[in-house]
Each structure stands twice: as structure tokens, then as C-alpha cells.
Amino acid sequence: LTGYSAYPRLIDFKRMREIADTVNAVLMVDMAHFGGLVAGKALTGVFDPVPYADVITATTHKTLRGPRGGLILCTEEFKEAVNKGCPLVIGGPLPHILAAKAVAMTEANTPEYREYAKRIIENAKGLAASLMKRGIELVTAGTDNHLMLIDVRPFGLNGRQAESAMRECGITLNRNSIPYDPNGPWYTSGLRIGTPAVTTLGMGLEEMEEIAEVLCSVITKTRSLSRNGKKSSKYVLDEGIRESARARVQKLLERFPVYPGIDLDFLRNAI
């Protein structure tokens, strides 16, 4: 079983196939997080699991950019088992969700989608470089895909504190364990951040530079309130930095709206 949800590099699936074959094992790949990059031909050759895996699981959301849901791909050998298993754990499929999945799959087969997948990785590499030049440490010192892991320990923080501080500033990401994490899976020592959503909005390398500035300002101006080595979720974020970060996030979102061309003022007026 191979795949990843928080690994910022690539897996050689040809090598995984060779290893599985040495012990006559089934190779199963979970590409829930990077399936959209495979569909968009941003991951090809040995980094594309489809030619090498016996069974593949994926989601229809995340990088594939469709509604929430999942799918299973398999070779002819496992077709009967998969077809028997799915009806036992899935019930009441919603027609409008099926239609939305069809739209997502259709989009994934277009040149525009392939450009989107390529730009996800370009933006991730740009954001990673911008963070590192500002002194932010990344696990594996960069990324080859759509995500990166920030190590917040050098700033005296744990992941839970840093995640909450970011949320105060209008930034959505999640705390995440890092290799040999001393803080465990609840507090963690890292932050996971990806670029699919901002790429969908139309942001590019210039915006990645600005996002890096905001992230760095929040991390460096957040102070842990942990005492005597005890883990804690409590922290203090400089109020001026919080307001400045929120304002910059708001301006970015105004420049890159979720629904460009649609007037949503009636919603604001209704509140």
C-alpha cells in the first residue's frame, strides 16, 4: 500500500511495482490527494501510478476539483471483488452529485485542466522557495507536488498554535505531523499548506510571494504560552499583525473572487 497525503515529494511507482512483484504482492495506491495531478498529466512516467498499480483509490474532490466523493480503479483481475464490495458500503447515490462528478471528469480531460495541474506545481514550488528565503524551514527543503510542510519548532510553536493563529488571519491550512515529531499527532510540529485552491482562483507566482510574506509575518509574530515544557494550544498573536494579515488576505480574495463575473452583492445586502 502506497500513496501520500502530506509528503512533498514524488513516489517512483515503477519501483514500487518491482518491490511488490518480488513477493507476489498486490500493489494498491491511494492517490486521493494527488489524483488531479495525475489526471492533468502533471505527474507522468514512473510518477503516475495508473500503469503500475493493481488497485487505486482516489477522491473526486481535492485536486480533482469535483464534489466530495471517491472512486476505485482496478485491473481486470480485481473487478469482481470491487463490484461486489461497493454496493455493500455505498447507498443512496445522489443524482445531482453524480452529475457534478461527470462535469469534473469532463473538465479533467481538457487542455485547460492540464494547464491548471501544471500551475499547481509551479505555484507550490514558488511558494516553497519564497518561504525558505524568509527563513521558514520546510520538510525535505521544498516540494515536487502541490503541498509543503512547514516546521514551526524553530519559532517555539507547535502546529496547533500556528494553525489557530493562521485561522485568526483568514488563512485555511492544517497542523500536521512531521518526521520524528516530538509533539505527537494532536499538537504536531508542522503546518501543511497546498496550492490547488489558490491556483483555481487564478493566483500565480506573484501572489505566492505575497502569501509567503503573510505566512511568515504570522508565524514569526505568534508567541507560545506553553510553560514548563508542557504542550499547550494557547498562544498570543500580535494584534497589529493579525489585522494586517487579515486585510491582505481580504484584498487578495477581492482580486481573485470565487465566482468571477457573478454579482454577489445581494447576499451582502441581505445580511
PLM region spans:
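Conserved PLP-enzyme active-site core in the AAT-like
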Residues: 1-135
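Generic non-transmembrane alpha-helical segments
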Residues: 19, 126, 130-134, 161-169, ...
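Structural beta-strand/beta-sheet cores of well-ordered domains, especially the beta-sheet scaffolds
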Residues: 25-27, 53-56, 68-70, 127, ...
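Short, well-ordered loop/turn and helix-capping segments at boundaries between secondary-structure elements
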Residues: 62, 107, 154, 168-172, ...
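Short acidic (Asp/Glu) and glycine-rich catalytic loops that position anionic groups and cofactors
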Residues: 78-83, 98, 102-108, 141-149, ...
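PLP-dependent enzyme catalytic core of the Aspartate aminotransferase-like
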Residues: 123, 185-271
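Conserved PLP-binding catalytic core of the aspartate aminotransferase-like
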Residues: 137-205, 266-270
